Amino acid sequence: MGCVPRIEFGCSSQSLTLSWNLRAWNLCRLNTISHFQKLPYPLVASTRKHYKNSLLLKRFLVGVGTEESSLSEDLLDESLSRPLTSDELKSLLIDTERSKLVKKLSEANQQNRFLKRQLKTQEHEITNIKTELALMELEVQALVKLAEEIANLGIPQGSRKISGKYIQSHLLSRLDAVQKKMKEQIKGVEAAQSKEVHVFWIGMAESVQVMGSFDGWSQREDLSPEYSALFTKFSTTLFLRPGRYEMKFLVDGEWQISPEFPTSGEGLMENNVLVVE
């Protein structure tokens, strides 16, 4: 005997499925349409009914998918064609300006790091030049002493003169001039070399930083606290070349002037003055 086809109708939250689960049929009895027509009428009617339902369901699912796709495209077109509101425009402008400022700040930091590396290289070269000049000055000083001894021994008979002076006296005067010139060069090198400068702030605070014209007001230098029974002293060491600088302290997020240093300017333009000799 043949087995009756079992029809499964399943529903889920994501999709609807219609499936036919045909159990094993006796193919010998269903090899022609006449055999199918001999099935009981209720079974045939039920089979036709479920077949129609499956077609309707397929059409419904295709329609729903098409409507959803069309709806999403319509929403996208509407959002693109709709003009920006004032708040959206302000937010867009703020984001654009923020991106520009971040880019400029990054470029400034890169330039600052490059200049610092160059400064360290120049400081090293200046130190080497100063050392070489100091050694040369010692040698010239020894030659000056030797020339003085020769001049003090007296002028041998037959000694020639240069510019109205005997060669012994002429040599001594020339060595003196060279020694003075080298001392001036050493002073110039020392003026170009950075010096340690102690900067401090006295008062009660959690954090203290200093900025100044010594680096173009681009970096904040942190000051370390030193506690005592009477007060708190924040200090740091800067390496600066001789000159006049202006600076200001950032104390707990507020710009302040230290009474320990002289000032220049008025109002918001008032700054402390730092002189490096």
Curated annotation (Swiss-Prot):
Q: What happens when the gene is disrupted?
A: 100-fold reduction of starch-bound GBSS1 protein and production of amylose-free starch.
The domain section of the record reads: Contains a C-terminal (199-277) carbohydrate-binding domain (CBM).
GO MF entry, a single one: polysaccharide binding
Q: What induces it?
A: Circadian-regulation. Up-regulated during the day (at protein level).
Q: Where does the record say the transit peptide is?
A: 1-44
- InterPro entries reported in the protein's UniProt record: AMPK1_CBM, Ig-like_fold, Ig_E-set
Q: Does the keyword Amino-acid biosynthesis apply?
A: no
Compartment list: Plastid, Chloroplast stroma
One BP annotation, GO: regulation of starch biosynthetic process
Q: What is the effect of changing W255A?
A: Loss of binding to starch
Q: Chief location of this protein?
A: plastid
General function of this protein = Involved in targeting GBSS1 to the starch granule. Was originally thought to be a carbohydrate-binding scaffold protein, but it has been shown that it is mainly found as a soluble protein and that interaction with GBSS1 is a pre-requisite for subsequent starch granule binding. Dissociation from starch as a function of pH, Mg(2+) concentration or redox state is not observed. Interacts primarily with amylopectin and is required for amylose synthesis.
Please give the Pfam families that the UniProt record associates with this protein: AMPK1_CBM (PF16561)
Output this protein's name.
Answer: Protein PTST, chloroplastic
Q: How is the quaternary structure described?
A: Interacts with GBSS1.
Q: Name the source's superkingdom.
A: Eukaryota
**Ranges in coiled-coil conformation:** 95-152
GO CC terms, sorted = chloroplast; chloroplast starch grain; chloroplast stroma
Keywords from the named record: Chloroplast, Coiled coil, Plastid, Transit peptide
Q: Which PANTHER family match?
A: PROTEIN PTST, CHLOROPLASTIC
